[in-house]
Amino acid sequence: GKQHEYVLNARNHEHPIMKGLPNKWKHAQDELYDRMRGPGNIKDCLYTAYSDKGTGGSGREEPLIFTVDYGNARIFHTMLGHAGETVENCPAMQCAGFQITLLRGAEWAATGKVTQKVPADFPTEKQVSNRSNYKR
């Protein structure tokens, strides 16, 4: 569907990646993929977002940040962070929420723990927080 801003909804506050993260936060303009499935099963659904039919979506909550059960591996998956039209116009990757959840997910996948603090510029339910100095 069409790229747009949308709110992510927390689904599992107990997972180490989620500790200290808000219940809801607004993601920058990005694609919201739906009906995505792979060979692994979702183990821990961390965040979902409503996929609005008005933007070409499914009309339901879709899992966007989750862990995958695949053997003994720790796998973190995010559907966020699609490229913009130019290096300068890349709001999805500039979003502090995308950057922080990706870093926390990578740390958890590597170590099973998350030591990173949630920064003050993490987005809120009403406000996107972009780090404009990010370059892809």
Language-model features: locations:
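Catalytic beta-strand/loop cores that center a nucleophilic Ser/Cys/Thr
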Residues: 1-74
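Extracellular ligand-binding/catalytic regions of CAZymes and related secreted enzymes
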Residues: 53-64, 69-136
